[in-house]
């Protein structure tokens, strides 16, 4: 079981790292998903997520999530082979939390150095995006 503190990690790099580990058969728990950063200009990133949410219709998908933990889990799932059983089983081994739950406060969390946001100044967090998209709880 791997525990990852996702604060100040880059969205895509973290997702691809976790997807590879899941396909290798490991179980992963990610906390602080609301503190994951997406690099780029805020206006373009917000427009991208708004356009994703507005595609399709109410009755037919695709359905895109509003909350930070579900946005991150969907991006990890998009990197897995969903139509194969090992891809579906891999996604079941991944747990994502927006903050640190009380049951996991005493665990030792890893930080992935290859996915850290070190010098990039233009970014927005998943927590900010989810508030803009209309997340109703925290």
From Swiss-Prot:
It holds the Pfam family Ribosomal_L13. CDD domains: Ribosomal_L13. GO terms for cellular component: cytosolic large ribosomal subunit. InterPro entries: Ribosomal_uL13 (IPR005822), Ribosomal_uL13_bac-type (IPR005823), Ribosomal_uL13_euk/arc (IPR005755), Ribosomal_uL13_sf (IPR036899). It comes from the Archaea. GO terms for biological process: negative regulation of translation; translation. The keyword Translocase does not apply. Transmembrane segments: none annotated. Keywords: Ribonucleoprotein, Ribosomal protein. GO terms for molecular function: mRNA binding; structural constituent of ribosome. The keyword Ribosomal protein applies. Belongs to the universal ribosomal protein uL13 family. Part of the 50S ribosomal subunit. This protein is one of the early assembly proteins of the 50S ribosomal subunit, although it is not seen to bind rRNA by itself. It is important during the early stages of 50S assembly. This is Large ribosomal subunit protein uL13.
């Amino acid at each position: 079981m791997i525990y990852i503190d996702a604060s100040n990690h880059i969205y895509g790099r973290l997702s691809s790292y976790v997807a590879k580990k899941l396909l290798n058969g490991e179980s992963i728990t990610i906390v602080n998903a609301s503190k994951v950063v997406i690099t780029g200009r805020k206006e373009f990133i917000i427009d991208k997520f708004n356009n994703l949410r507005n595609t399709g219709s109410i009755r037919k998908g695709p359905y895109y999530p509003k909350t930070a933990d579900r946005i991150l889990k969907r991006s990890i799932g998009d990197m897995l082979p969903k139509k194969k059983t090992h891809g579906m089983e891999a996604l079941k081994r991944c747990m994502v939390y927006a903050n640190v739950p009380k049951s996991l406060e005493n665990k030792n969390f890893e930080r992935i150095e290859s996915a850290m946001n070190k010098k990039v100044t233009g970014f927005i967090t998943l927590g900010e995006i989810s508030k803009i998209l209309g997340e109703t709880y925290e």
